[in-house]
């Protein structure tokens, strides 16, 4: 399958680089950098809302993935309407709608948020008022009700409470189904992982799954430990998703190029290996600084990039020493 450079790879490269510079601060001083607003975070990471075009990749005749600024968007288009998974930013919505129109779709009928983070759900601010039915796992909607801080270690983002019209109007606890465009779409929640409100969206007819940021294919994953995410949970969530699919399933990550069953399997093996080595160090009394200076990710750094953010947030999730919740 064709793969292309994903603009969010730059985001993770910059974020991880900033994170390494701040590791000591995160451990021994103020745990959260001064939170930025959307203008600050977009400037810090070089996001170009005006200049970034939407790139479309076909999965099946009725399922596509849109790449732009923010999380990958899955688009189901057919006789029943348009269902999307994640919606990026309102600044991108005209181009997102145009891309959907080129696929033969009209207005977005349903938008599923894989979780509540701004780069996957801020598009709600445009879609909700336009009449789109917004959907999420119940914990994600709960997070959207109030102001949140997302600690990315080197930087932090101040995510404001969503207005009423941008909140999910349909929520679920563990599972729900759509029957749309000739296929069954399963929404499944397997507990805390990247956040406490993650959703795997499985398109049964297309044999594809969108995992949101539980599966990051642009670098190491970010564990939002400050808001209840855990490294153990990411591994569990991915394993339970793997049990729902087969070896020919297309796997859509939250960021990075489209992947497959083997890619997700390798991701699970990598995180399990890192987690096990980290736990061995923790049980021997290792500090965060010990973990950060170790070589437990050396086998993966060449392809995944800087591990600092994963190690920091993973350490705190495994030791339950999260200092910024």
What are the residue ranges of the model-derived segments?
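Zn-dependent metallo-beta-lactamase
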Residues: 23-80
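Conserved beta-strand hairpin/beta-sheet module of binuclear metal-dependent hydrolase folds
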Residues: 55-99, 201-203, 208-213
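Bacterial N-terminal signal peptides that target proteins for export
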Residues: 1-11
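Accessory terminal helices/loops
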Residues: 15, 19-22, 27-45, 243-247, ...
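Divalent metal-coordination and catalytic microenvironments
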Residues: 62, 76, 86, 100, ...
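Active-site metal-binding motif and surrounding structural segment of the metallo-beta-lactamase
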Residues: 56, 79-83, 91-135
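Metallo-beta-lactamase
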Residues: 58, 81-82, 89-91, 141-193, 204-205, 238, ...
């Amino acid at each position: 399958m064709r793969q292309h450079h994903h603009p969010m790879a730059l985001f993770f490269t910059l974020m991880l680089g900033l994170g390494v510079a701040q590791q000591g601060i995160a451990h021994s001083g103020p745990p959260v950098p001064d939170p930025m607003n959307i203008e600050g975070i977009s400037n810090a990471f070089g996001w170009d809302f005006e200049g970034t075009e939407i790139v479309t990749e076909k999965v099946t005749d009725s399922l596509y993935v849109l790449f732009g600024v923010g999380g990958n968007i899955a688009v189901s288009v057919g006789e029943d309407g348009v269902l999307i998974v994640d919606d990026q930013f309102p600044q991108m919505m005209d181009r997102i709608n145009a891309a959907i129109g080129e696929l033969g779709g009209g207005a977005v009928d349903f938008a599923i948020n894989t979780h509540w983070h701004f780069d996957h759900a801020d598009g709600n601010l445009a879609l909700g008022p336009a009449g789109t039915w917004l959907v999420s796992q119940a914990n994600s909607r709960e997070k959207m009700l109030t102001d949140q801080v997302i600690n990315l270690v080197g930087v932090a983002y101040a995510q404001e409470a969503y207005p009423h019209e941008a909140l999910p109007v349909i929520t679920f606890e563990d599972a729900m189904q759509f029957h749309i465009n000739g296929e069954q779409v399963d929404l499944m929640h397997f507990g805390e992982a990247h956040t406490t409100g993650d959703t795997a969206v499985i398109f049964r007819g297309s044999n594809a799954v969108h995992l949101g940021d539980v599966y990051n294919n642009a670098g190491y994953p970010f564990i939002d430990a400050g808001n209840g995410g855990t490294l153990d949970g990411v591994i569990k969530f991915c394993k339970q998703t793997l049990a729902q699919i087969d070896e020919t399933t297309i796997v859509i990550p939250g960021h990075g190029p489209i992947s497959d069953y083997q890619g997700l399997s390798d991701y699970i093996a990598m995180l399990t290996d890192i987690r096990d080595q980290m736990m061995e160090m923790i049980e021997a009394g290792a500090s965060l600084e010990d973990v950060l200076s170790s070589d437990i990710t050396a086998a993966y750094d060449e392809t995944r990039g800087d591990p600092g953010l994963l190690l920091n947030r993973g350490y705190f999730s495994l030791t339950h020493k999260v200092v910024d919740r």
